[in-house]
Amino acid sequence: MKIISAVRHSGKTYHSKSLGFVDCDKIIGEAIGWPSHFDKKEFSDKIYSSPLIDEHELAVQFSRDSWKVLEDYTNETDVILSIPEVWSARSFWEWPIKPNVLVTIDEERHKQNLLEINQNHMWPTIKFWRHLLEHEAKENDIKVVNTFEDAILYLNEN
């Protein structure tokens, strides 16, 4: 399994369409849907259902279920998969995975992406995550590149 990770709002969904890798958000949405509070309606109209009420417990269960979906999908299909920063030690997600490569797009492009979706107030948080993930990637021998094109080239060569 070859995996690209990228900080949120870096364009993984957009680039997956033009570069031919698979966006995990789409696979999960089609298979089991998303909890309504995750606001992922652009990926699926399905709502993830669970008897759990507590949002944290629901998120952890969804995390486990969504990883199972991706594991099954990649066992059946030879693809490059893109995931968000769920592999970080500071993430609540329960995905037992490390990416092969981390994409950190140009900071100005990242700010522009946030501006385009009216989320520019998130830049301080996103900037923190960018630095944190770069540090964790280096500690875990995960290749860091600046573009999705470079990530695809790296994965195809290794």
Labelled PLM ranges:
Residues 2, 18, 88, 96-99, ...:
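Compositionally biased low-complexity segments enriched in polar/charged residues
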Residues 17-71:
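Conserved substrate/cofactor phosphate-moiety recognition/catalytic segment
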Residues 31-37, 108-117, 155-156:
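Short, charged, surface-exposed secondary-structure boundary motifs
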Residues 81-85, 94-114:
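Conserved phosphate-donor/acceptor-positioning beta-strand/loop module used by diverse small-molecule
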Residues 116-158:
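Small-molecule kinase domains that catalyze NTP-dependent phosphoryl transfer to phosphate-bearing small molecules
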Residues 8-9, 83-89:
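Short, polar loop motifs at secondary-structure junctions
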Residues 1-19:
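Glycine-rich phosphate-binding P-loop
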Residues 75-81:
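Loop/turn-to-beta-strand initiation segments
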